[in-house]
């Protein structure tokens, strides 16, 4: 945690700012040629994540190109599975794979009885390296996946659009699902504590698949576990950002102990700010596809996004989803410059 007044943190806490801070989800990623080169040098995605020097390097790459207002730890929400010895691997054009997914009581019982956060020491070393490079010039956002979102991958075994196994467990064996979520929550608490101890300035919780749940299930199987993590890791001066692709269920979030909500591009920033009675800062929410258009369209998108939040503070400019590999780096440069210029208070 930094003692410096960083623009991002000030806006999240809704203090006086001179312009809107901007950063980009997946800002270190496949749209940057230097990232591809470093990933190839490492020998693959997971080898890159587990190499503290190279993970630091790719974290810094977008900051060398663009005047962004935060660094984002280069990692993945599924590395927490290293605490369970679940052998996470990635394959190009497929994504994450667990060869032995958790689908039965027997599968769960085969995992270690004690979780070992030291299996994530490579993340701690990456954070230390990044903090050294930043030298307090910018804040560093650390992150985790929500227990529900992580569980969807551990149960399905890969990235899927059907979610048949986790939905089946939700209906037929909710007790087993709860035990899996308890395990992930326990590991996530230790992991977040380590990130904060090693210097991250904010924690973001990606509840990417929270929208699969509705009503009481959303509260019971997602928000309940997120709140347990927040309550167990609260650190003064380290704000918590919650992100979901959900287009509904927002009423369930009102009692969550967070500081900022990241929303997708389908929602109106100002309406969301008022819906939550200005309790939370709002992050977002330019449609990523606009970055495929000409500069005049990008500028109009920036103006429209800023105009939907007509308040002096409490907005963090971002995309509605993570940036995609087909975006040209020059378009990002133009976007960031426009946000900085057009958001001056």
Briefly describe each language-model feature range.
Residues 2-18, 50, 115, 119, ...:
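Metal- and O2-centered redox machinery and metal/ROS homeostasis
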């Amino acid at each position: 945690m930094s003692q410096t007044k960083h623009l991002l943190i000030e806006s999240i806490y809704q203090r006086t700012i001179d312009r809107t801070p901007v950063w980009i989800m997946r800002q270190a990623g496949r749209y940057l040629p230097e990232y591809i080169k470093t990933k190839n040098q490492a020998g693959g995605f997971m080898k890159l994540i587990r190499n503290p020097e190279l993970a630091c390097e790719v974290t810094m790459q977008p900051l060398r190109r663009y005047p962004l207002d935060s660094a984002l730890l280069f990692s993945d929400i599924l590395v927490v599975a290293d605490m369970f010895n679940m052998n996470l691997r990635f394959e190009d054009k497929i994504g994450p794979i667990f060869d032995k997914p958790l689908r039965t009581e027997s599968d769960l019982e085969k995992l270690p009885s004690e979780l070992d956060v030291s299996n994530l020491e490579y993340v701690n070393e990456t954070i230390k390296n990044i903090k050294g490079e930043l030298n307090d010039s910018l804040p560093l956002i650390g992150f985790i996946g929500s227990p529900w979102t992580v569980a969807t991958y551990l149960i399905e075994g890969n990235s899927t659009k059907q979610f048949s196994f986790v939905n089946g467990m939700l209906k037929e064996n909710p007790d087993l699902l709860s035990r899996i979520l308890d395990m992930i929550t326990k590991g996530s608490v230790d992991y977040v504590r380590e990130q904060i101890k090693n210097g991250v300035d904010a924690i973001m919780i990606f509840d990417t698949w929270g929208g699969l749940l509705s009503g009481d299930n959303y509260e019971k199987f997602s928000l309940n576990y997120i709140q347990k993590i927040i309550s167990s890791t609260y650190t003064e001066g380290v704000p918590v950002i919650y992100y979901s692709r959900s287009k509904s269920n927002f009423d369930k979030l009102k009692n969550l102990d967070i500081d900022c909500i990241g929303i997708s591009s389908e929602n109106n920033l100002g309406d969301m700010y008022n819906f939550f009675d200005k309790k939370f800062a709002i992050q977002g929410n330019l449609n990523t596809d606009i970055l495929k258009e000409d500069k005049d369209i990008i500028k109009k998108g920036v103006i429209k996004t800023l105009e939907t939040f007509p308040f002096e503070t409490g907005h963090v400019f971002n995309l509605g989803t993570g940036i995609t590999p087909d975006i040209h780096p020059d378009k990002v440069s133009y976007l960031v410059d426009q946000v900085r210029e057009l958001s001056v208070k």
